Every structure is written in C-alpha cells, then in structure tokens.
C-alpha cells in the first residue's frame, strides 16, 4: 500500500509538472519591462516569451505579435524553444508509461513488468524536468546579468516574468515525481523470495509439514481397525 500511495503522489506531481511546463512554454511573460532609471515613466510596457512578445499600453490594451521568424531570435530563446518542446514531449511519454506501470491500473498484469515500466516513467520525468529547468535557469541568469550590468541601457533591461517562476516550479515537480516513481517499487529479490521458493519445491513435498511444525494428529475414526467389525 505504501508503494501504491507513492506512485499516486509521484504521478500527480508529474502531471502537474507537465501542465505547468506547457503553460510556461506558451506564456508571453518570460521577460517583462523593468521600470528603473529613465524608464520609470513610460506609456507602454513590454513582455517577451518564447513565441511572441506583447505590448501593454497605459489604457489597459494589450497587443501580442508572434515572432515573424524563429531563426533571427537570440540563441538562448532558440535553445529554450527546443528544450521546452522536448521536455513536454518526454514528460507526456512519462505520463503514459507511468500509467501502464502503476499498480492501481489494469494494464500489463505482470507485476515485475509494471515495476520496470514505473521506473522507466520516473526516469522520463527526471529527464523532462532537467530539460525544462535548463532553459529557465539560462534565461533567469541572462535577465539578472543584464539587469545589474551598467553597460546595458535602462530601456533594454527586463525583469523576471511569471512564466519563469512557473517553469521552475514545474520542473521541480517533474524531478520530484521521477525520483518518487523510481524509488516506489520494492526490490525484486525481497518481494519474490517466497514465490520463487514455492515454485522451486517439487509437488511431492508441497503437502509435507514445514520444519518445526508438528504433524497433524490422525482422527479418532482412522485409529480403529476395520477388521474388528467383520
């Protein structure tokens, strides 16, 4: 029961990590305008994501435009696009494999195969979490570096957007989910020792009493000889 509960907790965390990664990948708020120095008073605020950038006017109107070309984007944005898409794909595969390997499902009745599939799903969650964490940390480092650099104009400085916070939390969820699934399955030797020893016994000895167990007493009826009544 403990391993079943751990598998459920791990799967829920992995599913939340996948959904959070998808939302963070699509949000256009990886970088937001920084209101420091000469850019404190401005009528337009900008935010940039992996696929589009948005401009929010003082009137409350927001306009978003998808990038016209992907090849002209900075290297960190292109790498983040590839890694986030790969992370989402691997995490989706991890969800499918983990469902088959969980003990509460009816797929693949062989318990040993289910345990292996659960571990494989956990490994996929770990890989997906790492692929989602790397681009988020990379962009986070770039934002902080430019923000504190005196060589970058104030109008070109950005702050950390909500999507980066969501990406960090989602990747951590995926990593924790993978670790839980990998360690939720018991050791094969401890679980199947009795089963293997029972299968190894010959048929003639399965009905014999175990060592240290007293033999069953014969019934009173069997103790009488039938020849005494003839």
Curated annotation (Swiss-Prot):
Gene that encodes it: CLDN2
InterPro entries with a match to the protein in the record: Claudin (IPR006187), Claudin2 (IPR005411), Claudin_CS (IPR017974), PMP22/EMP/MP20/Claudin (IPR004031)
Cellular compartments per GO CC: bicellular tight junction; plasma membrane; tight junction
Site features described as Paracellular cation selectivity, chain residue numbers: 65
PTM per Swiss-Prot/TrEMBL: The disulfide bond is necessary for pore formation, but is not required for correct protein trafficking.
Modified residues (Phosphoserine): 219, 223
Cross-link named Glycyl lysine isopeptide (Lys-Gly) (interchain with G-Cter in SUMO), sites: 218
Annotated region described as Interaction with TJP1, TJP2 and TJP3, given as residue ranges: 229-230
Quaternary state and interactors: Can form homo- and heteropolymers with other claudins to mediate paracellular barrier and channel functions of tight junctions in response to physiological stimuli. Homopolymers interact with CLDN3, but not CLDN1, homopolymers. Directly interacts with TJP1/ZO-1, TJP2/ZO-2 and TJP3/ZO-3.
Natural source organism: Canis lupus familiaris
Cited function: Forms paracellular channels: polymerizes in tight junction strands with cation- and water-selective channels through the strands, conveying epithelial permeability in a process known as paracellular tight junction permeability. In intestinal epithelium, allows for sodium and water fluxes from the peritoneal side to the lumen of the intestine to regulate nutrient absorption and clear enteric pathogens as part of mucosal immune response. In kidney, allows passive sodium and calcium reabsorption across proximal tubules from the lumen back to the bloodstream.
Name used for this protein in its record: Claudin-2
Classification of source organism: Eukaryota, Metazoa, Chordata, Craniata, Vertebrata
Cytoplasmic side: 1-7, 103-116, 184-230
Compartments it resides in: Cell junction, Tight junction; Cell membrane
GO biological process terms, semicolon-separated: bicellular tight junction assembly; calcium-independent cell-cell adhesion via plasma membrane cell-adhesion molecules; cell-cell adhesion; innate immune response in mucosa; paracellular transport; regulation of bile acid secretion; regulation of intestinal D-glucose absorption; regulation of intestinal lipid absorption
Residues annotated as transmembrane: 8-28, 82-102, 117-137, 163-183
Protein family: Belongs to the claudin family.
Keyword annotations: Cell junction, Cell membrane, Disulfide bond, Isopeptide bond, Membrane, Phosphoprotein, Tight junction, Transmembrane, Transmembrane helix, Ubl conjugation
């Amino acid at each position: 029961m403990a391993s079943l509960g751990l598998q459920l907790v791990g799967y829920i965390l992995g599913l939340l990590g996948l959904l959070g990664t998808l939302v963070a990948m699509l949000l256009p708020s990886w970088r937001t305008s920084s209101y420091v120095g000469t850019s404190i008073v401005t009528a337009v605020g900008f935010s940039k994501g992996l696929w589009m950038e948005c401009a929010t006017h003082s009137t409350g109107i927001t306009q978003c435009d998808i990038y016209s070309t992907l090849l002209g984007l900075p290297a960190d944005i292109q790498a983040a696009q590839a890694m986030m898409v790969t992370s989402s794909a691997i995490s989706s595969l991890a969800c499918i494999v983990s469902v088959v390997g969980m003990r509460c499902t009816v797929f693949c009745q062989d318990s040993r195969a289910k345990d292996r599939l659960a571990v494989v799903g956990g490994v996929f969650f770990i890989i997906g979490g790492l692929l989602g964490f790397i681009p988020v940390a990379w962009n986070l480092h770039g934002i902080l570096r430019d923000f504190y650099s005196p060589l970058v104009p104030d109008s070109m400085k950005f702050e950390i957007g909500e999507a980066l916070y969501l990406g960090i939390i989602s990747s951590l969820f995926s990593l924790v989910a993978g670790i839980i699934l990998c360690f939720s399955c018991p050791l094969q030797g401890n679980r199947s020792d009795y089963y293997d020893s029972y299968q190894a016994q010959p048929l003639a000895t399965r009905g014999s009493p175990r060592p240290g167990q007293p033999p069953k007493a014969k019934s009173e009826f069997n103790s009488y000889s039938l020849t005494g009544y003839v």
